[in-house]
Amino acid sequence: MIDPIDGTRSFVIGNPTWSNLISLNFKGNPVVGLANFPILNKYYLNFDNKNSFVFEQGKKRKIFVSKNVPFSKIKVSGAFHGAVSLKQQMKIPKVLKLMQFPTADALSYSHFCEGKIDVVFQTTNKIWDIHPLMPIIKAAGGVVTTWDNRDAVNAGNILVSANQLIHNKMLKLLKPVSK
């Protein structure tokens, strides 16, 4: 599966956060993932379901999500992309308070895999948006589901967290706006 330009709006305005996303799927499940950021001259890769790597400035580095961060100190990147009304957002004030970083499409998920961000949530992901990232996220140690705690393979509103404890707390906080 190929998403030739993930972050189309970023691409159009010249923001360097757009990417090329590629996944190899087997029986509908992503097994290999690549997130390439041409302008940033870096890419993220998982090809064995065991290890995820970032390649930058000619160097390969194994990446991991942050694991032992207390919930009170998590770094959250999120976006509603117009899919959750302002009225609905008012039902989740704790989530809004946690949001510290706007999402940058696939780059937010990639930074999550490096442990720079502890939680990423986005609405309206398509399968070509999330399939290439799922193997990278999982092999880096992350948890990835929909907001209603279903397998992310069918896309939709996606939540990724550094560990199951954080994930469960975020699912509970997002529940009022989960479909």
Language-model-detected regions and their locations in the chain:
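Short glycine-aspartate micro-motif
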Residues: M1, G33, V120
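Generic detector of well-ordered alpha-helical packing
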Residues: P4-G7, P38, A106, T123, ...
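Buried hydrophobic positions in well-ordered alpha/beta secondary-structure cores of metabolic enzymes
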Residues: G7-T8, V76, F112
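Flexible, acidic active-site loops/lids enriched in D/E/S/T/G that coordinate Mg2+ and/or position polar
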Residues: M1-K27
